Each structure stands twice: as C-alpha cells, then as structure tokens.
Amino acid sequence: MKCKLVNKDIRENYTNELLMERGLSPEELQYFLDVPDDSALQDPINLDYIEQAGAMFEYMTTCTNQETIAVIVDSDVDGFTSAAIFIQYLRKWNTVVNIVPILHKGKGHGLSDTYDDVINTHPSFVVIPDAGSNDFEYIEKMAQEFEPPIYFLILDHHIVEPDTHFSDYAVIVNNQLSPNYKNKDLCGAGVTWQFCRYYDSLKGTSYADEFIDLAALGIVSDMMSMLSLENRYIVHTGFKNIQNYFFKALCEKQAFSMGGKVTPITVAFYITPLINAMIRAGSMEEKERCFTAFIDGHQLVPSQKRGAKGTYEEVAIESARECTNARAKQNRVLDKVVEELEIKIAKHDLLSNKILFIRLDDEDFPPELNGLCAMKLAAKYQRPTIVARLNDEGEIKGSSRGLNESELTSFKNFMDESGFFTFTAGHDNACGIGIYDKNLSAFHEYANEKLANVDFGENWYEVNFERIAADQDIEQLIYNIAEHEDLWGQGNPEPLIHIRDINITKHDVQVMGKSADTVKIVKFGIAYMKFHAKQMLEDLAKYDVIKLEVVGRANLNEWMGQYTPQIFISNYQVEDGALAF
C-alpha cells in the first residue's frame, strides 16, 4: 500500500483549508459552506439561443389537444430527470396538448435509435433534453418528412465537435456552446431547469423551483463536479426540499442504507444505481412505468407484485419496488456474464497485457452491462479494463474502467495520449471508448511499454491527511470532516486519511456483526472499523503484537446521544509489531 499526500499538510481548519487547496477562493469557500442564497446561480440568459428557445416554447404552450409534442427520454438518470422536468413544466402552461415521452429500447442517445418512433407520433415539435446537439443529419431528414416541417428544441450539455453542423430546424441550448455561461459542469437536467427559470422570468412565475430536486438528482447521477458553486447551490437546495414523489419513494426505500441522510454520496451510492438498473435491465413496460413515476407518481397502476393481482398501487411506489428488483436481476445477470468472461480471459491469456482488453464476439448480453462488467473485472484482476464489441466497420466500441487506487490516476488521459482511440467520452476512470481493431495490437505494445513499471496489484492512494495514531488532533479532524458530509461528491471527493503506527495486540481486535466479519479496533479514543473483513481478520491473527497502518474515511457514530469518532478503513497494512521495537 502506497500513499501520497496530494495537498499541503493541513493541521487546522481542516475542511476549509482542504477546499481552498482544491481551488476555492476565501469568498467562494464561505458561500460553499453556508449556501446563504441563490447568488451562485447564473442568469439563464447567458445560455446562447435561450431567447429563441423561449419563443419556441411559447408556441408549445398554445398547442391544442389535436397536436403532439414528442419528448425523447435519454437512457440514463440525467435523461430521465431532464425529460421529467420539461414535461412537468410544460404541463404548468398547457394541460391539453398530447405529450408523448419516447424511451430508448437500448442505451441509445438522441434520435439515432428513436427516429421511427418519433415519426409515428406525427409531432408538431420534438424536444430532446440531455442529448441531440450532434444529431444534425437526423434532424434535417426528419424535419422535412412533414409539411409544414417540424421543429426541434434541444436542451443539452454534451461537448460538440468543432466541425459540427447545426440545423435551421433546431434551437440548441447547450452550456458547452455558450461562452458566457461559465459552469461547464452543468448536466442536462441542469440546463433544462435553467431553461424553465428563463421562461419563469418572462412570465413572473416560479414554477421551476418545484423541480430543483430533479435537477440535483441529475447533477449527482451524471457525476458532475460538486466543486462548482452553481451545482453546490442546486444540489444543496434540491436535496433539502425533495418534492418529487418518486424521488421521495426511492429515498424512503433506501433510508436504512442511506442512514436517513440525503447527500451527494448517499444518492450516488443508493438511489442512482436503482434507476440505472431499471434503465439497463428493466422491460420496456417497467421503464415506461419508471418514467411515469417521475412525472405523475400518484397515478394508480395495476400492481405487478406477487400475490397482489387485481389491486392497484401508486406508480411511484410500484416502480420503486420494481427498481429494487431490477437491481437484483441486473446483478444476477452480471455475475453470470462475468463468469463467462473469466473463462475467456483464461482461454486467451488476456492477462498477459497490462491492460485487460476483452473484445466481445459471440457473447450474448446487453451492451448496457459493458461498463459494469469492466468495473467488476477491473476490481478482480486489479488492472485497467476495457469491455467492448467489434462492429461491422472494424471499430471496437465499449466501456473502460480504471483503478481509482493506482498510480495511473486517469485511464482516460492515458488512452487519449496513446493516439490510438477514435474517442474517449466520460470520466478519468470510467468512460466509453472506440478503437479500430487494426490498432489494438499496437495499443497493447504501447501500454505494455509505458506501464511496465506500474504494479496495479499494489494499491496507491492519494490522501489528504497524514497522521500517526498518537496525534492529538485526529478526533477533531474526524468531527470537522464528518459534520460537512453534504459537501463531498464528484470532483470534491470525501477526504482520505492515512494513519500509521497503530500499535495494538491481538486482544485489541474486536469481532462484530451477525457474520462475525466486522473488525473494530479502538486506539486513543478512535474506533477503526472495517466491514466484510474476513481477510483482515486472518492478517491480524498472524501476530500477537501488531503494527497497523490504514487508509480510510472519517465517520461519526451516534448512539443514544453519544458520538464516537471512527475511521472506516478502505485499506490496511499489517506488520509484526514485535519487530518494530
């Protein structure tokens, strides 16, 4: 286990100093901590073409019950929340127009796989939240299928290539295309919500306020930076005022796992995966129910619950249950697929390269699981992993996952710098990729040479605080970090603490839990905890006197009004303490 302190050695004002190390100015810091008002929100007028979008929306508000507005629902949580915000907002202004949500059958985006479905609705307008900026050819073709032509409203946040053409039939509002809009970390739901704020400003209303919780859910689920002051305001305000009935139902279902707290981390770990599982593994009927739950959660639907035939349930409650089932189903399928891929790895000696690259051929499983498979295999084999399929054009497309605890801090940057990939889209250690099959061998040669001295089996941590167990300020450090638990998220990760010289005997090791696999060690008033720790128990049992080193995260345990400072252990190193004296 290797650790590197990535900021200055902070010995006071722990959270404040860390946030300034991460780029906040003193003025920004105070706002970030307190969120006293909405001054961090940018004026939506800074989004290019928003006035034209408002004019198009004005026409939508006048559509009759003989007209249709098609809304394409992108296939991720940001897509669902973006479309849900738009539809509910439009309903504030027009209760009669026929609004048709169109869901992707797979993990598609924009018009690429929804073209025929949209055409069949004979729409007057097509709205594409969280996608569509790159759909020039589809828009041009579809617009002219009708006379008069149909028009498109695109509310997006994705990066657009410099040579992209834009159709005269579309109004595109995109923060990436708006030089005056400074927050490039706003997601599709955020852009959609800002559009609603703009229209409110024209009409003297505040309907958009009702949907800030969905904008917050989209921001967290799409892994946008939580260091952005605007994102901080939206997420802080949205999670404090959850109004969407389905979002509430999901939080109630996951309340135990979330510890009753709605924060960027608890939502990312316990809410987003449920919705993603439904999008990936649910039937079309179940996915449609899930989206309906977002826009009309109190609607009664026939219960699909075993033993409840002939009864009705609110769709938000029904879909929350189905999302949980979809997660379990997805995990079962995933386990089976990973087993099959492990056979392929062994058969073709794929571990001979520094990058585990699995080119799929005949494997029959949904491409929506590529990323999850890559994540599981990367964790098991402790190396960056790509799971991808070869298409008819000779290009391999799929998903990559790097290791967060390794010397290779950005697998995405590594692939970009190699020059072999046609695209990498996503985050440092989780992104979609494309590479021509003819370049695969050359990439392996490049990677094997560049990474020859990198030991992916040895965990490597970028830590924010380093201490020895006897340091007097560890308790204060834990309290300070834990009381700011709603700050941490993507781009502003929960601080890692590295503690050395925890000198104990085997009698200091407490074994807890129903499965007797939870470790608790108390030293100098700090409880060091690790769950599912059978391997750690074996390692600790080797010695009578133990020198322990840990990397972990701060936690405050509350019981009957009493608080215990804890470190939740991420990783550890055990040495024979008898040799240390």
Model-derived regions, located:
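OB-fold single-stranded nucleic acid-binding module
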Residues: 431, 439-443, 470, 546-581
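Conserved phosphate-handling catalytic cores of large alpha/beta enzymes
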Residues: 116-119, 126-145, 151-215, 224
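Hydrophobic helix-and-loop "lid/oligomerization" segment in the mid-to-C-terminal part
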Residues: 2-125, 143-150, 200-448, 467-469
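A contiguous loop/helix-start segment that scaffolds small-molecule binding in enzyme catalytic cores
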Residues: 239-240, 244-248, 449-538
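Short beta-strand/turn micro-motifs composed of small residues
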Residues: 73, 130, 156, 389, ...
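Nucleic-acid-binding small beta-barrel platforms of the OB/S1 family
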Residues: 192-194, 405-408, 574-581
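Active-site proximal loops enriched in glycine and acidic residues that flank catalytic Cys/His/Asp
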Residues: 130-131, 359-362, 389-390, 400-402, ...
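Short nucleic-acid-contacting surface segments enriched for D/E, G, S/T with interspersed K/R
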Residues: 535-551
